[in-house]
Amino acid sequence: MERFLENAMYASRWLLAPVYFGLSLALVALALKFFQEIIHVLPNIFSMAESDLILVLLSLVDMTLVGGLLVMVMFSGYENFVSQLDISENKEKLNWLGKMDATSLKNKVAASIVAISSIHLLRVFMDAKNVPDNKLMWYVIIHLTFVLSAFVMGYLDRLTRHNH
């Protein structure tokens, strides 16, 4: 009975495979939105104010960072929790594949969230005259919470690695 339960639990990790595949579909949706934004901006590029263009560019950078985060979570999560990726030697392989454990992934995700939050906060500040003060305050508080959380996670990771 114990062996059966252990084997069943171990096999259940494959339930994550469709979830990671779903992230690849989310990546397709993000890419479509990215190019929709570019197509929307190009006809108006010469009549746009510089600040409006910068806001669009920040939005594109934001989407790119989210896309990178999706790829990192998708591949690292799959390799850490489901199965090793068998990529043929002839194909280009990302140099970090197989080297990122769950803790490294967590720290990279935290750093990515801080970067994404920074871009979002910059976009908000560029349009600060149209944003109520209390909303600005909450954006800053939330961003600082992300920064502090990432710092604490990195610090705790460093402590545990140093003690082992």
Swiss-Prot record:
Listed transmembrane segments: 15-35, 53-73, 136-156
Bilayer topology annotation: Multi-pass membrane protein
GO cellular component terms, semicolon-separated: plasma membrane
InterPro entries to which the protein is assigned, alphabetical: UPF0114, UPF0114_bac
Disulfide cross-links: none
Any GO BP: response to hydrogen peroxide
UniProt superkingdom: Bacteria
Keyword annotations from UniProtKB, A to Z: Cell membrane, Membrane, Transmembrane, Transmembrane helix
Xref: Pfam families: UPF0114
Database matches in PANTHER family: UPF0114 PROTEIN YQHA
Family statement: Belongs to the UPF0114 family.
NCBIfam families: HI0507 (TIGR00645)
Protein name: UPF0114 protein YqhA
Originating species: Escherichia coli (strain K12)
